[in-house]
């Protein structure tokens, strides 16, 4: 029986694809070597321990119908569209070795006519007239008896959209001498005009087979039929939930302030697991009572725009004469936390 397994997803749903990845990783025999190929429609994928409100422009994402997906590996936030090819290599220990999977991807690129090399811990770069440019980034996850390496290859991604949805870490950029995320990446189509997702998948597959000296039939994973994977429904429900994608953010504090015609407002929130654990409201309004009441209502509230609006508008019952102020406050809060 072959120790290789090849899976290809025809879904563009990031929650579906990450749920498939998680299920395969959890139930695969430790003797198996797996290659999973996939891609996502417009999505910001964040690392397991990242704060989406800090890393992403969540308001712009909502306006543009861009999804947020939290992966189970570490690392930073990335933007995916259909111009990215995603790959995941899995293996049991002690065989799991990310240098092997990296070499498979490099061999695939070489077969396509692209000379690339590994750079740092996570990137693959190509040399251009403007200097080294990143074409691939990766992240990793290990458990006691297995590990995986997953990453993306930029084929013809809309690089102008990176800045729309990601808030770059200025300290990180300064430490690396980088002026912007956009300036240091390039698409493979700049080197191979017309290259397609299917061609890249075929090249990676052939390099995978060549390395292990075996061939297997591909298993096509489709959203039209629930994958025959243990606990898939539960894993997908978790992967697509607000509690996982937003609620798993590390504890953080958020200060919001605004000046209205009726006074200035400062909101101080402490947030843990997506819930407000402490809310303080400061104002120079001539009638601070509704804002003082709001602070109490927000304690324990989900840190989600619709929930904040709901709590604010509930005060209209007790403070009908402040309807204008409360509706202005509600709309501002909802926009500020998206």
Swiss-Prot record:
Record's keyword annotation contains Ligase: yes
> In its keyword annotation, does this UniProt entry include Glycoprotein?
no
Q: What more does the entry say?
A: In the transfer reaction, the free carboxyl group of lipoic acid is attached via an amide linkage to the epsilon-amino group of a specific lysine residue of lipoyl domains of lipoate-dependent enzymes.
**EC category:** ligase
Function description: Catalyzes both the ATP-dependent activation of exogenously supplied lipoate to lipoyl-AMP and the transfer of the activated lipoyl onto the lipoyl domains of lipoate-dependent enzymes.
What's any GO biological process attached to this entry? protein modification process
Would you tell me the protein name for this molecule? Lipoate-protein ligase A
Query: What are the alphabetically sorted keywords of the record?
Result: ATP-binding, Cytoplasm, Ligase, Nucleotide-binding
Span of domain BPL/LPL catalytic? 29-216
Q: Which GO terms describe its molecular function?
A: ATP binding; lipoate-protein ligase activity; lipoyltransferase activity
EC number from the UniProt entry: 6.3.1.20
Write out the similarity annotation: Belongs to the LplA family.
Which NCBIfam families does the record match to this protein? lipoyltrans (TIGR00545)
Pfam assignment, any one: LplA-B_cat
Q: Which Gene3D superfamilies match?
A: Bira Bifunctional Protein, Domain 2, CO dehydrogenase flavoprotein, C-terminal domain
UniProt subunit comment: Monomer.
Where ATP is bound, by residue? Answer: 71, 76-79, 134
């Amino acid at each position: 029986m072959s120790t290789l397994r090849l899976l290809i997803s025809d879904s563009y749903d990031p929650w579906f694809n990450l749920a498939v990845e998680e299920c395969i990783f959890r139930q695969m025999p430790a003797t198996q070597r797996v290659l999973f190929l996939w891609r996502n429609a417009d999505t910001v994928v964040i690392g397991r321990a990242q704060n989406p409100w800090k890393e992403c422009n969540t308001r712009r994402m909502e306006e543009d119908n861009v999804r947020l997906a939290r992966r189970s590996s570490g690392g930073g936030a990335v933007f995916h569209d259909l111009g990215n090819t995603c790959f995941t290599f899995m293996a049991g220990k002690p065989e799991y070795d990310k240098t092997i999977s990296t070499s498979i991807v490099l061999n695939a690129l070489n077969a396509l006519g692209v000379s690339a090399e590994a750079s740092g811990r996570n990137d693959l770069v190509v040399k251009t007239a403007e200097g080294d440019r990143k074409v691939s980034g990766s992240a990793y996850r290990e458990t006691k008896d297995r590990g995986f390496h997953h990453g993306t290859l930029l084929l013809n991604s809309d690089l102008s959209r990176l800045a729309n949805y990601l808030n770059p870490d200025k300290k990180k950029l300064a430490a690396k001498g980088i002026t912007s995320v956009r300036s240091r990446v390039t698409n493979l189509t700049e080197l191979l005009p017309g290259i397609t997702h299917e061609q890249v998948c075929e090249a990676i597959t052939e390099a995978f087979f060549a390395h292990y000296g075996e061939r297997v039939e591909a298993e096509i994973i489709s959203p039209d039929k629930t994958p025959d994977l243990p606990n898939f429904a539960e894993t997908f429900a978790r992967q697509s939930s607000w509690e996982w994608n937003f609620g798993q953010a590390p504890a953080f504090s958020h200060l919001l302030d605004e000046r209205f015609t009726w006074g200035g407002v400062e909101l101080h929130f402490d947030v843990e697991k997506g819930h407000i654990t402490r809310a303080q409201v400061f104002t120079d309004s001539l009638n601070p009572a509704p804002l003082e009441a709001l602070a109490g209502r927000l304690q324990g509230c989900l840190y989600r725009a619709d929930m904040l609006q709901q709590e604010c508008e509930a005060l209209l019952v007790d403070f009908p004469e402040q309807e204008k102020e409360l509706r202005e406050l509600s709309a501002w809060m909802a926009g500020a936390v998206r």
